[in-house]
């Protein structure tokens, strides 16, 4: 196919990894009419074919072609694959091409970008759209996935104000509410409010299916169990990489959580209804308050 470099709106956007996030981004960009073309890069023929079929991308290219001909490149691959993507992109990255990503961890991705891209790291503005779902793959994509949802941007010192503003505009164009924080803040916060909940959901599911009477238990699950374990249906590969990529912050949150669980276990063992109710009331009120934020 013929690729033409443009400057209209965001021009040619290449999305590397057209799963749920990548394909949804393609749909959203095209619906917003802020691009000339969206190109897909990926290893999954199934996702690429599905993205083409649904109109999320206009064509398929390899990463080298994307680096040579794109105005914006968005990395939507698992965080452990970011370094390899940077390594492929770096020799062909044009000075006017901007990079952003959708990774759920930032410290490790930024380190890889700086080590691989060197002086070109100024062209990378890290981002994390707080959107997704238990389903994964292009088949689950939807154009309104980012509408009204936060996208966190963690600018580098090397980024120019103009480049940061461009990537802010890029994510806002698909309906995202952009917030800027440091990568250190990002990884500490999301270890608690995103990464830990996924780990706990996987852990509960694993606990039940590994028990001797697993079949009987699963035959009796209700809405509460299904709600709690919904996110355990998320991509195992992605969450493996997130856990390892943000392990320092995650281990800190896990230790704090386990201390609470041990405290609750002691209250139950001691038949301490007053202590349990006090703990539950505090947590319950905090959860109710969350709904009015």
Language-model segments: residues:
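Rossmann-like NAD(P)-binding element
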Residues: 63-98
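Internal alpha-helical scaffold of NAD(P)-dependent oxidoreductase catalytic cores
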Residues: 143-230
């Amino acid at each position: 196919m013929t690729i033409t470099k443009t400057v209209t709106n965001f021009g040619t956007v290449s999305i590397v990894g057209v799963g749920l996030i990548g394909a949804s981004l393609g749909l959203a960009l095209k619906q917003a009419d802020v691009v000339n073309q969206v190109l897909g890069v990926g290893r999954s023929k199934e996702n690429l074919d599905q993205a083409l079929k649904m109109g999320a991308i206009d064509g398929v290219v390899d990463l080298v072609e994307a680096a040579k001909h794109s105005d914006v490149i968005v990395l939507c691959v698992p965080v452990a694959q970011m370094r390899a993507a940077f390594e492929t992109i770096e020799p062909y990255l044009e000075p006017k091409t901007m990079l952003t990503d959708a990774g759920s961890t930032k410290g490790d991705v930024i380190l890889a970008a700086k080590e691989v891209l060197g002086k070109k790291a100024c062209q990378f503005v890290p981002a994390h759209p707080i959107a997704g779902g238990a389903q994964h793959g292009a088949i689950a994509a939807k154009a309104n996935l980012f509408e009204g949802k936060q996208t966190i941007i963690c600018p580098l010192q090397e980024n120019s104000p103009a480049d940061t503003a461009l990537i802010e505009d890029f994510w806002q164009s698909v309906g995202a509410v952009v917030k800027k924080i440091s990568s250190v803040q990002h990884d500490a916060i999301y270890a608690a409010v995103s990464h830990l909940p996924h780990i706990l959901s996987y852990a509960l599911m694993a606990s039940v299916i590994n028990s001797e009477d697993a079949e009987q238990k699963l035959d009796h699950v209700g809405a509460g169990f299904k709600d709690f374990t919904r996110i355990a249906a998320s991509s195992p590969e992605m969450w493996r990489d997130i856990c390892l990529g943000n392990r320092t912050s995650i281990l800190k949150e896990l230790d704090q959580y386990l201390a609470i669980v041990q405290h609750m276990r002691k209250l139950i063992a001691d038949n301490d209804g007053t202590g349990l109710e006090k703990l539950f009331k505090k947590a319950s009120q905090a959860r109710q308050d969350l709904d009015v934020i």
